[in-house]
Amino acid sequence: MMAQQYKYNPTDYVDYLCESMMDFYAALPEGNALRLSGIWERIYFDTKQAMKEHFLSPAERDDIIAYYEELIPDA
């Protein structure tokens, strides 16, 4: 099995954001748009919290949520 390369390494981020990113990557092979959208919502709020706690800049947050949104297949 080849390892998939992703733009963001979850372990580079605060624990709660790392967890939601890892959940997203784990669900990605299934291609379930509804499930991925739910996890994306968690990433959305986790990045907002990380930004409030100064773990992310606003630009980093925007890039992360846009990247994960692009990975969700069309329903």
Regions found by a protein language model. Give the residues of each.
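Acidic, Ser/Pro/Thr-rich low-complexity regulatory regions
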Residues: 1-75
